[in-house]
A protein has these predicted regions:
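Soluble "head" domains of membrane/secretory-pathway proteins
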Residues: 2-9, 14, 43, 47-194
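Short N-terminal signal/transit or membrane-insertion segments
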Residues: 25-29, 34, 76
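Alpha-helical transmembrane signal-anchor/signal-peptide segments
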Residues: 30-47
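Hydrophobic membrane-insertion alpha-helices, especially the h-region
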Residues: 10-29
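Alpha-helical transmembrane segments and their juxtamembrane interfaces
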Residues: 24, 37-38, 153
């Protein structure tokens, strides 16, 4: 009888180890964890939000308009990771009219995901209002248009610089006490799927 329990326990532990190992392999091969540390994607993403981005070759070869992507930007011999929304696909014409209306191939694009207050493009030094996206490149914008550093500033991003498409985000809220310099309460309120 004792041998049976030992055998059952051994098999159960082996199954648990296989499940955990499979989960870790899938997570590391297919997904990358992210922490948002910028406000250029407000109100969709906030500083401190956690998420997972898919990084499979199939997903990265099927990028669609409005996908939120994580990519590497190299400027002045420095590399940094940014999170932005895909607006223009290869070979499309992007145009800003009246400082806030966004047109793709002469069609007005509805942007329900941005705050109307941040939609205005004034005071950001926009030198160019019309863009033609080259082959294998994308035009990206932050949802917080008034402060976002994006394709309006650094130009198009190469397809091969994109290493993830955001799929899950956990909205993170915390109360910071300025007197104690500590977070008093942290809550993970909701999940958002893209």
């Amino acid at each position: 009888m004792k041998k049976n329990w030992t055998k059952i326990l051994t098999i159960t532990l082996e199954i648990i180890i296989i499940i955990i190992a499979s989960f870790l392999v899938i997570r590391n091969v297919c997904y990358t964890a992210i922490i948002v540390n910028q406000s250029s994607m407000n109100p969709t993403l906030n500083d401190g939000d956690y998420g997972y981005a898919i990084k499979t070759k199939h997903a990265l070869n099927n990028i669609k308009r409005f996908d939120i992507v994580i990519f590497e930007l190299e400027e002045n011999n420095e590399k940094k990771d940014l999170i932005k929304r895909i607006i223009g696909l290869p070979n499309e014409e992007i145009e800003f009219k009246d400082d806030s209306d966004l047109y793709v191939n002469n069609v007005l694009i509805e942007q329900d995901f941005i705050d109307k207050e941040t939609q205005k493009l004034t005071n950001i030094g926009l030198k160019q209002k019309k863009f033609i996206v080259p082959e294998n490149q994308y035009f990206v914008l932050g949802d917080n248009r008034g402060i976002s550093y994006d394709s309006r500033n650094f130009g198009y991003i190469e397809q091969n610089s994109i290493f993830g498409i955001l799929k899950i985000i956990t909205k993170h809220y915390s109360n910071y006490n300025n007197e104690t310099n500590k977070y008093e309460k942290e809550e993970f309120i909701s999940f958002k799927f893209f």
